[in-house]
Amino acid sequence: MHTPPDTGMAGKPFRATYIWTNIINNLQTQVEVKRRRHNLKIYPDCFLGSEAVDVVLAHIIQSKVCGDAEVPRFKAVRLCQALMEARVFEAVDTKVFGKEKRQAKFEDSSCSLYRFLNRQTPSTSGSETIGSGYNTQRNTNSPPFQRMEDSAYSNNSPVKTDKSLEDVLGNLNMNTTITPQMMNLGLSQELMDEIWRQQTVLRLLQLIELPLLESLLEGQESPRPPLHSMDSDPDLLYTSSYLDREILKAFSEAQADSWLSAAVDCQEFLPDQLVVDVSRGLAKCEEETSQYKQLLYGVLVQHYGQSDYPPLLTNHVFDIHSGVSELLVNGKCEQALESLQLCLKLQDSRSREELRRLLRFMALAGSPHQIKLHKEIENRMAVKRAFSNAIVYGTKLAKGKVDLLVLFMMDKHHDLFKIPVTLHKLVSDKLASIIKGTDPDRITGTTYCRHLSGKEFVETVQKTTREELWTLLKTIHENTKLSLKEKRRLLGQFYKGHPEIFVQYFGNRISNIYI
């Protein structure tokens, strides 16, 4: 007999190519490409590794590429590695102490830069991205960035790789069937933004018990002023403060020190007068790194140490910060990290970026191997003391909890600005319910109650009661602080009320129990 052909494999190369192309197109249109500063130098038309993973993961989940299966973040990282090997994008050449260094392995990090190959990339002079991968505005009038030496890749043709597309997608356990969801979600950007916000709030309510919801659902603080840059205001080119900012950038590029680079990055958020003071102060310093660092650190402390400085974690979600600190006190670090990630998704992009830069600087400056910042306390405590008021609203929060929260954010600053996988899943389920025409207000994701029949309710009550009584009897029996007389009295009372459980607990030892 002849074995019939596997009809499920028919057309698989086409489906795999289609999925692959959609992932690439989505990454190119959704990831934030702009001029970035890294290791003392500015690189044009780049995107962050962590943001690429966010975009790819969101596309995989929302498009149901893997069906309803949970997609861990490491699979999106693996797919980004395959995209880099396929020459869709490359790691940006960075100079570390004068030597060219190119990453051979894709890194899910906010410090790793990548650049698309053979793609018209808008400059960031007119671009602004809010969120990570789902709210993007771009200017298409900028000159394109092209790489002439790489011509193997094209959006309209299969990618030439050492591995077949089927192997790449198969290793990720992806479903290669084209679905209507993958073709076109048909949803407006406004609706998408609202869905992301709703599901972010929903997930926060699952992690943290909030006494009041009005501030979270309705309260919005006015966004902070934009960065001081020629991109947002061309007239700045003719001001002295703009020249001072450019002097600081040039100074940073000339120094082989990540501490100085992180400090100068924070200067972009400072008012003009402080920037002018820093620029002129550097000119008066001797050519010693320690003097440069003392000057930059002092100016940052002066700016962020103001008593009336508005904290970067917005006050209208103070209850979230209080809840996160409680999670940390109880040792629930994973839930605390996810709660902070969700909280940051509710903030404006400007505050989020300023906080990211400040935490990066604090982590570098807080190292014991860096320049001593305070005569009596270690660097880690010095930066915590100097910048805590600029991060979280500490008037109503106990000082110990504020310190714990700030130090935790310093330690986790690399992961703090990533999108949790659970949020991706909630958004995916919500989109699926809308596309299928089911109730859009139906709660998706994890639920904590279900309808029980009368019989199930009785069985649950009996089981729970038995378990609690067993625990109570065990506590009485094993409590070494009770006197023998008191223990006999309590055991006697328990035996009179629940003899069956008493006999089951002691078994053959019941003859040795004096009650």
UniProtKB/Swiss-Prot annotation:
Residues 121-144 have a biased composition (Polar residues). Residues 121-160 are annotated as: Disordered. PROSITE patterns: DEP. It comes from the Eukaryota. Residues 27-118 form the DEP domain. GO terms for biological process: intracellular signal transduction. Belongs to the DEPDC7 family. This is DEP domain-containing protein 7. It comes from Danio rerio.
